[in-house]
């Protein structure tokens, strides 16, 4: 098995979660409720946490929102959820933290955008107040720079210097450098203001895949801070998923990235939890972490003119996800389970043998039977109208036997070993 080389960084503690170096890449999400509605926000955080989000960011943009943060924390604690809350501050964060000190205490991390804290001396004072508040409350800070809200005074200074140079760079290259400089200079200021280096996480978000890869490669080479990855706006549907996967997979494979968020634009009627599931699937398909049993299924072809195997694959995936809230506690290691649902004799038996448990359904013109393979061996053949029910029962029994208290696969974790550079 290959060993993935991760950047060696400071390790940042955010409540019970460790971020950086050999620590697992952490999945983050963000609510879209009105934070002033404490009940709705707490319930959505619960939903995101149930889906697998390990930290959740909430908007703190008004006195009404700030006044409810402590209540949101209490509601989550009462429900048994220790999910760390990240306060997303823009424009007026210092005022809200000053007026509502319990807000700052209830949060586990502050997100500060240097581009919209303020200009000149006044902006420096606002930034300083927020950093000192974080230090006093022993909270972590993500200094998050965005392409769309870059500090314009810094950008102008760097553009002017570029024009005056003997070999000026294209403006877009200067803008990328300004993103990095903004993050690094802000982190340096934060340390001088008393925030320890192991309380700082950086991000430099843009919307284009190649730009994100370039910026993070450079940022990662110039600091030892953990990095939060994500496109500023990935977009809707398959475009958003593909863009996020393309960008983050390259960086993660190079050992860059310690927390991730998939910033999908929700489609009408789609669950907010989709961004969490996509993040999990990126990490799991790369072999970096395991969250839920994965289903391998063939794409179908002229040999599989029926939809039986597709329906069974979907049923199995849904069943596994629904069971994980219980299985995660009862059967440690079950998240590494691999199930194959194949549609014909061409690759069906082979893929089924390679999975922990697999079924090869008959293709067009094949004998209407479905052999089931367990740990590489053919164990039983199913046929008739109850194949789905019978196969799920076999999966259930396999999980109990192999991941139960005395199971041989209990606590096993099939992930790529991690080393720090």
Swiss-Prot record:
Annotated GO biological processes are: isopentenyl diphosphate biosynthetic process, methylerythritol 4-phosphate pathway; terpenoid biosynthetic process
> What cofactor is needed?
[4Fe-4S] cluster
Q: Which UniProt keywords apply?
A: 4Fe-4S, Iron, Iron-sulfur, Isoprene biosynthesis, Metal-binding, Oxidoreductase
Against Pfam families, the record matches this protein to: GcpE
**Where does the chain bind [4Fe-4S] cluster?**
298, 301, 344, 351
What is this enzyme's EC?
1.17.7.3
Catalysed reaction, written as an equation: (2E)-4-hydroxy-3-methylbut-2-enyl diphosphate + oxidized [flavodoxin] + H2O + 2 H(+) = 2-C-methyl-D-erythritol 2,4-cyclic diphosphate + reduced [flavodoxin]
Any single GO molecular-function term of the entry would be: iron ion binding
In which pathway is this protein known to take part? Isoprenoid biosynthesis; isopentenyl diphosphate biosynthesis via DXP pathway; isopentenyl diphosphate from 1-deoxy-D-xylulose 5-phosphate: step 5/6
Q: List the disulfide bonds.
A: none
Does the record's keyword annotation contain Iron-sulfur? yes
Q: Does the keyword Signal apply?
A: no
InterPro entries found in the cross-reference section: Dihydropteroate_synth-like_sf, IspG_bac, IspG_bac-typ, NO2/SO3_Rdtase_4Fe4S_sf
Note describing how the cofactor binds: Binds 1 [4Fe-4S] cluster.
Family of the protein in this entry: Belongs to the IspG family.
Q: Which NCBIfam families match?
A: ispG_gcpE, PRK00366.1
| Function noted in UniProt | Converts 2C-methyl-D-erythritol 2,4-cyclodiphosphate (ME-2,4cPP) into 1-hydroxy-2-methyl-2-(E)-butenyl 4-diphosphate.
Q: What is this protein called?
A: 4-hydroxy-3-methylbut-2-en-1-yl diphosphate synthase (flavodoxin)
């Amino acid at each position: 098995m290959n060993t993935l080389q991760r950047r060696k960084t400071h390790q940042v503690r955010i409540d019970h979660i460790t971020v950086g170096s050999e620590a697992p890449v952490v999945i983050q999400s963000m609510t879209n409720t009105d934070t002033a509605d404490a009940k709705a926000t707490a319930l959505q955080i619960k939903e995101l946490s149930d889906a697998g989000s390990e930290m959740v960011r909430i908007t703190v943009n008004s006195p009404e929102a700030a006044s409810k943060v402590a209540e949101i924390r209490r509601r989550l604690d009462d429900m048994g959820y220790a999910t760390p809350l990240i306060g997303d501050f823009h424009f007026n964060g210092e005022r809200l933290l000053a007026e509502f000190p319990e807000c700052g205490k209830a949060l586990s991390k502050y997100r500060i955008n240097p581009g919209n804290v303020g200009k000149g001396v006044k902006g420096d004072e606002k930034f300083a107040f927020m950093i000192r508040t974080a230090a006093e409350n022993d909270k972590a800070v993500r200094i998050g720079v965005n392409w769309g809200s870059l500090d314009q005074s810094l950008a102008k200074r760097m553009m002017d210097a570029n024009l005056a140079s003997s070999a000026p760079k294209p403006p877009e290259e200067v803008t990328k450098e300004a993103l990095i400089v903004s993050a690094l200079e802000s982190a340096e200021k934060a340390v001088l203001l008393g925030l320890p280096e192991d309380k700082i996480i950086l991000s430099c978000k843009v919307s284009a895949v190649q730009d994100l890869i370039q910026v993070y490669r450079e940022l990662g080479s110039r600091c030892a801070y953990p990095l939060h990855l994500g496109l500023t706006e990935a977009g809707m549907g398959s475009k958003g998923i593909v863009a996020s996967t393309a960008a983050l997979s390259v960086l993660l494979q190079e050992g860059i990235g310690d927390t991730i968020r998939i910033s999908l634009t929700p489609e009408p009627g789609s669950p907010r939890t989709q961004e969490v599931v996509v993040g999990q699937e990126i990490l799991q398909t790369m072999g970096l972490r395991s969250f839920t049993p994965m289903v391998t299924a063939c794409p179908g072809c002229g040999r599989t003119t029926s939809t039986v195997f597709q329906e069974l694959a979907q049923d199995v995936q849904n069943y596994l996800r629904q069971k994980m809230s219980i299985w995660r506690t009862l059967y440690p290691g079950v998240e590494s389970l691999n199930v194959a649902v194949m549609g014909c004799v061409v690759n069906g038996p082979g893929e089924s043998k390679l999975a922990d448990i697999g079924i090869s359904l008959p293709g067009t013109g094949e004998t209407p039977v479905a052999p089931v393979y367990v740990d590489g061996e053919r164990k039983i053949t199913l046929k008739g109208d109850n194949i789905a029910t019978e196969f799920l029962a076999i999966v259930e029994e396999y999980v109990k036997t192999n991941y139960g208290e005395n199971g041989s696969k209990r606590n096993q974790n099939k992930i790529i070993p991690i080393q720090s550079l």
